[in-house]
C-alpha cells in the first residue's frame, strides 16, 4: 500500500467510526424512553431529535468551510492563519448558538408547525426542546472545532470526542431517567451535558495541539485572545472569504435538505405504508453515506493540504486513490444489498406487510452505491479546495432535475418515479462535479496560490 492510500485510510477510518456512533446514540435514547412511558415519549424523542438534526444539518457549513480553509493553511504551514480560521468559526458558531437560545420560542413554533407534531406529544417535545436548545452554542462551536481538526489532518480527535460524548450522553440519561426520575427531561439533560462536555474536550485538544507552536506559547492566554480577536476582526478580506465560502455551502446544503425532506413528504402523501417502506429502504443510503463520508473527510483534509502546498502531482494521485477506495465501496455495498437486501429488511423490522411492500422497490437500493459514490468524493475534494461555488451550482442543477423528473414521471410510475428521481439526483451531482473539476479545479494549481 502506497503512502497516499495509507494517508487516506488514516483519515477515513476514524471518521467512519465517528459516523457509526450517531445511530447508536439515537437507538440508546429511544431504548431509554421506550421504558418510561407510552408511545408519546418515543414520538417526542423522534420529533425533537429531528428538529435539531435539521437545524444543525443546515449549519453544517461551519464544519466544512473551516475544514477547507484550515487544510489549506496547513499545507502552507501558516499556523497563525489556521488558528484565525478556527477563531472565526468559533465566533460564528457560538454566536449563532446564542441567537438560537434567544429565539428559541420562535424556532420551536416554526419547527413544530412544519412537522405537524401530534397534540399528544406536544408537551413532551416542548420540554425536550427547551432543555437541549441550551447546547446550541456548544454544538455549533464543536462543528467548527471538528472541521479544524480535520483540516489539521487529525480525524482521531473528532472520533474520540464523539465516542466520549455518546458515552456521557447514555450514562447521564440513564442516571437522570432511572436514578432521579426525570423521564424525557432526563434524556434531554443527558444530551445537554454531553454536548458541552464534547465542546470543552475539543477546546482542550486545541490547546494541547498548539502548545508547541511559537506564536502560541510566546503569549499568555489573555494576550493570545486579544491578538487573535484584534487580527481576526480587522482582517476584512478574510471575513469576506469566510462568509462567501460558507454561504455557498449553506445554500448547497439547503438543496440537499430540500430533496431529502421532499422525498419523505412525497412518500407520506402515498400513505403510511409507502412512507414506512421508503424510510426503511433509505437506511441503505444512510449506511452507505456513513462510510463514504469518511473518505470525503479524508478528501477535505488532503485536498486542502496539497492545494495549500501547490502539489498538483500529489493531488492527482490522491484523487485517483480516493476513487479507487470509492470503487471498492461500490462493489462491497452493491454486493451486500443485492445478495442480502431482503435479510437486511428483516433485520430492521418484523412487520411482514412493510417488508412485502418494500420488495418491489428494493431493486433501486442496488444502484445507490454506484450513483452516489462520485458525489461524496467530489464533495470532499471541493471542500478542501474551497471550490464551494461549484458545489452549489451542481447541487442546484441536480435538485431542479430531481423535481422536474419526479413530477413528469409521477403519474406513470408513482413511488418508482420518486426513487428514480433520487438516483438521478445522486448521479447528476457526481457527473456535474466531474466536469466542473475538469474545467475549473485543476487550473487553480497553475496560479500563484498565495491566497488562503
Positions of PLM-derived features:
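Interfacial/gating helices of multi-pass transporter permease domains
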Residues: 33-53, 119-124, 184-185, 237-245, ...
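Membrane-helix boundary and inter-helical linker elements of multi-pass secondary transporters
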Residues: 35, 72-75, 151, 180, ...
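Small-residue-rich hydrophobic transmembrane alpha-helices
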Residues: 42-102, 139-157, 277-335, 339, ...
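Short runs within selected transmembrane alpha-helices of multi-pass transporters and secretion channels
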Residues: 63, 131-151, 158-169, 187-203, ...
Amino acid at each position: 500500500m502506497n503512502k497516499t492510500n495509507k494517508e487516506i485510510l488514516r483519515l477515513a477510518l476514524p471518521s467512519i467510526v465517528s459516523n457509526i456512533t450517531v445511530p447508536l446514540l439515537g437507538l440508546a435514547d429511544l431504548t431509554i424512553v421506550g421504558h418510561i412511558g407510552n408511545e408519546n415519549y418515543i414520538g417526542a424523542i423522534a420529533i425533537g431529535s429531528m428538529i435539531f438534526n435539521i437545524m444543525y444539518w443546515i449549519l453544517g457549513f461551519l464544519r466544512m468551510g473551516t475544514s477547507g480553509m484550515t487544510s489549506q493553511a496547513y499545507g502552507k504551514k501558516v499556523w497563525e492563519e489556521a488558528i484565525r480560521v478556527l477563531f472565526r468559526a468559533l465566533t460564528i458558531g457560538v454566536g449563532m448558538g446564542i441567537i438560537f437560545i434567544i429565539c428559541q420560542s420562535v424556532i420551536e413554533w416554526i419547527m413544530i408547525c412544519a412537522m405537524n407534531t401530534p397534540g399528544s406529544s406536544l408537551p413532551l417535545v416542548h420540554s425536550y426542546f427547551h432543555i437541549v436548545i441550551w447546547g446550541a452554542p456548544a454544538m455549533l462551536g464543536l462543528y467548527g472545532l471538528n472541521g479544524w481538526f480535520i483540516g489539521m489532518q487529525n480525524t482521531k480527535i473528532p472520533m474520540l470526542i464523539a465516542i466520549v460524548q455518546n458515552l456521557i450522553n447514555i450514562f447521564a440519561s440513564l442516571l437522570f431517567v432511572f436514578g432521579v426520575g426525570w423521564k424525557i427531561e432526563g434524556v434531554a439533560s443527558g444530551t445537554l451535558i454531553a454536548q458541552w462536555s464534547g465542546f470543552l474536550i475539543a477546546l482542550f485538544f486545541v490547546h494541547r495541539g498548539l502548545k508547541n507552536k511559537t506564536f502560541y506559547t510566546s503569549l499568555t492566554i489573555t494576550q493570545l485572545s486579544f491578538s487573535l480577536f484584534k487580527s481576526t476582526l480587522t482582517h476584512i478580506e478574510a471575513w469576506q472569504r469566510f462568509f462567501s465560502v460558507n454561504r455557498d455551502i449553506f445554500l448547497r446544503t439547503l438543496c440537499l435538505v430540500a430533496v431529502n425532506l421532499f422525498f419523505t413528504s412525497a412518500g407520506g402523501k402515498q400513505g403510511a405504508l409507502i412512507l414506512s417502506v421508503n424510510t426503511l429502504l433509505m437506511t441503505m443510503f444512510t449506511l452507505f453515506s456513513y462510510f463514504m463520508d469518511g473518505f470525503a473527510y479524508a478528501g477535505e483534509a488532503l485536498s486542502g493540504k496539497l492545494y495549500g502546498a501547490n502539489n498538483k502531482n500529489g493531488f492527482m494521485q490522491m484523487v485517483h486513490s480516493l476513487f479507487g477506495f470509492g470503487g471498492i465501496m461500490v462493489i462491497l455495498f452493491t454486493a451486500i444489498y443485492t445478495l442480502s437486501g431482503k435479510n437486511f429488511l428483516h433485520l430492521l423490522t418484523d412487520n411482514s406487510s412493510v417488508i412485502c411492500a418494500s420488495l418491489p422497490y428494493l431493486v433501486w437500493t442496488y444502484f445507490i452505491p454506484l450513483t452516489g459514490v462520485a458525489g461524496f468524493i467530489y464533495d470532499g475534494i471541493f471542500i478542501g479546495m474551497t471550490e464551494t461555488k461549484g458545489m452549489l451550482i451542481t447541487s442546484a442543477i441536480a435538485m431542479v432535475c430531481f423535481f422536474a423528473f419526479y413530477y413528469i414521471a409521477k403519474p406513470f410510475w408513482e413511488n418508482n418515479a420518486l426513487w428514480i428521481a433520487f438516483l438521478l439526483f445522486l448521479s447528476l451531482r457526481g457527473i456535474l462535479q466531474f466536469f466542473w473539476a475538469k474545467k475549473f479545479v485543476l487550473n487553480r494549481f497553475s496560479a500563484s496560490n498565495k491566497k488562503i
